[in-house]
C-alpha cells in the first residue's frame, strides 16, 4: 500500500495541485492530511474543493485553523500565549468568508484525530498531540525520538502522523514511526511544496519525503496584488 502524506496546506492551491499531481504519478492508494487545510493563504475554497474531488481516497483531521472556523477564534494563540492582533483576526475572517457551505460542512465532518489500520499497521493521525483539556502540547519544532515518545505517550500505534510545526521531522524508535512532513503550503524561502509517501508492504514500513517544485513567485505576486488583511506579515513569516 502506498499512502500520500500531507499537512498544513494553508489555502495554497498551487502547492496542493503540484503535490496531488505528483501523487497521481506515484499512484498512491490513499491520501492522509494532518490538518490545517485552510488559513494563511488566499485560496481556501479551491483547496477544500480539490480535496473533496478525492474524498474517496482522503483521510483528514482538523487542525487549529479548522477549529478557528468552527469553534471561533481563541482569546490567545496557543503556542506563544499572546492575543491575536486586529489584523490577524481580520485575516481569519477574510479567509473564512471565502468558503462555501459545502466546504464548511466538509471541514465540520473532520475529526480531531483518527486511529485507523492500513496495510496491517495501526496509524494515529492528529494535527498535533493534545493535553487532556484539548489544548496542544508543547510546540517542539525539531523533536528527538525521545520527545516524540513523550508527545504521544497516551496513544498506541505503529505510525504517528502529525503536523502543525511546519517543520519536517521523522523519527523511528522501538519499531514506531513518528512523521511530520512539514508544511505543504508554507514554502518559507524555498520553491517547494513538502509532502511524503508512506509504503506499507509485507509488514514493512518505508517512508520517503518528497519536495515538489512549483511557482512560488506566482503565489507571492497574487498575495501582493490582493493586499488582504495581514498579508505583509504572512509573506514575511510563511513565504
What kind of region is each of these model predictions?
Residues 2, 6-98, 108:
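Core catalytic region of metal-dependent phosphoesterases/phosphodiesterases
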Residues 82, 86, 119-153:
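Active-site-proximal segments of metal-dependent phosphoesterases and phosphodiesterases across multiple
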Residues 140-171, 177-178:
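Anionic-ligand binding region
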Residues 6-7, 31-36, 59-64, 126, ...:
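Active-site neighborhood of phospho(di)ester-bond hydrolases with catalytic His/Asp-centered motifs
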Residues 11, 38-39, 130, 167, ...:
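Short active-site segment of divalent metal-dependent hydrolases/proteases
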Residues 171-239:
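Acidic, His/Gly-rich catalytic cores of divalent-metal-dependent hydrolytic chemistry
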Residues 87-122, 146:
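Metallo-beta-lactamase
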Residues 1-3, 115-124, 173-177, 204-206:
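Beta-strand-turn-beta hairpins that frame and shape the catalytic cleft
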Amino acid at each position: 500500500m502506498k499512502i500520500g502524506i500531507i499537512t498544513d496546506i494553508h489555502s495554497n492551491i498551487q502547492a496542493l495541485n503540484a503535490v496531488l499531481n505528483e501523487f497521481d504519478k506515484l499512484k498512491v492508494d490513499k491520501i492522509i492530511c494532518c490538518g490545517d487545510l485552510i488559513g494563511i493563504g488566499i485560496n481556501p475554497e479551491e483547496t477544500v474543493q480539490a480535496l473533496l474531488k478525492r474524498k474517496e481516497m482522503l483521510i483528514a483531521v482538523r487542525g487549529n485553523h479548522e477549529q478557528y472556523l468552527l469553534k471561533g477564534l481563541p482569546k490567545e494563540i496557543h503556542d506563544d500565549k499572546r492575543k491575536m492582533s486586529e489584523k490577524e483576526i481580520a485575516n481569519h475572517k477574510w479567509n473564512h468568508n471565502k468558503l462555501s457551505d459545502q466546504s464548511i460542512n466538509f471541514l465540520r465532518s473532520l475529526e480531531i484525530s483518527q486511529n485507523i489500520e492500513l496495510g496491517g499497521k495501526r496509524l494515529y493521525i492528529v494535527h498535533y498531540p493534545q493535553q487532556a483539556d484539548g489544548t496542544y502540547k508543547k510546540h517542539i519544532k525539531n523533536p528527538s525520538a525521545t520527545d516524540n515518545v513523550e508527545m504521544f505517550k497516551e496513544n498506541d500505534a505503529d505510525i504517528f502522523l502529525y503536523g502543525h510545526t511546519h517543520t519536517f521531522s521523522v523519527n523511528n524508535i522501538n519499531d514506531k514511526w513518528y512523521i511530520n512532513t512539514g508544511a505543504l503550503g508554507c514554502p518559507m524561502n524555498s520553491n517547494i511544496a513538502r509532502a511524503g509517501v508512506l509504503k506499507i508492504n509485507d509488514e514493512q514500513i518505508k517512508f520517503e519525503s518528497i519536495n515538489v517544485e512549483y511557482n512560488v513567485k506566482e503565489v507571492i505576486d497574487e498575495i501582493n496584488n490582493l493586499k488582504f488583511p495581514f498579508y505583509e506579515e504572512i509573506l514575511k513569516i510563511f513565504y
